[in-house]
Curated annotation (Swiss-Prot):
This is Salivary protein 15. It holds the Pfam family Salp15. It comes from the Eukaryota. The lineage of its organism: Eukaryota, Metazoa, Ecdysozoa, Arthropoda, Chelicerata. Glycans are attached at residues 22, 92, 104. Residues 1-21 form the signal peptide. Keywords: Glycoprotein, Secreted, Signal. Its main location: secreted. InterPro entries: Salp15. It comes from Ixodes scapularis. The keyword S-adenosyl-L-methionine does not apply. Expressed in salivary glands. Detected in host skin, at the site of natural inoculation. GO terms for cellular component: extracellular region.
């Protein structure tokens, strides 16, 4: 009889754990969803080969994007911030930051961002060669 009660307790604890895990998972409103999604291995970023850590750069750009929102007083703090690897211009050292559905802002890449296969960085934009797809 005691083992039956113990088994019920184990089952109840297991179910509580499963429900708690499902309810505590990230939602679309979670501000860090983009960070978590970017860290997943199944996200394929299309940055040039001379970018050594694609995910690190994407997270850095997302932070710059989020930080830039504070300079736009009219933006709602609840709007989502998004970057898209298709709109990172390594030749001109800029990227597109999207705040919510309506506001697109072009921002500068950090000066230490590689912008060419021979060690060029955005500190000297005139030496940047950008990205040639397929190379």
């Amino acid at each position: 009889m005691e083992s039956f009660v113990a088994m019920k307790v184990v089952c109840i604890l297991f179910l509580v754990g499963v429900v708690a895990a499902n309810e505590s998972g990230p939602t679309k409103a979670d501000a860090s969803t983009a960070d978590k999604d970017t860290k997943k291995n199944n996200v394929q970023l299309r940055f040039p080969n001379y970018i050594s850590n694609h995910q690190k750069l994407a997270l850095k750009l997302l932070k710059i994007c989020k930080d830039s929102k504070s300079s736009h007083n009219s933006l709602s703090s609840r709007s989502s911030d998004v970057i898209n690897d298709k709109y990172v211009d390594f030749k001109n050292c800029t990227f597109l930051c999207k705040h919510g559905n309506d506001v697109n802002v072009t921002l500068n890449l950090p000066e230490d961002t590689p912008c060419g296969p021979n060690g060029q960085t955005c500190a000297e934009k005139n030496k940047c060669v950008g990205h040639i797809p397929g190379c």
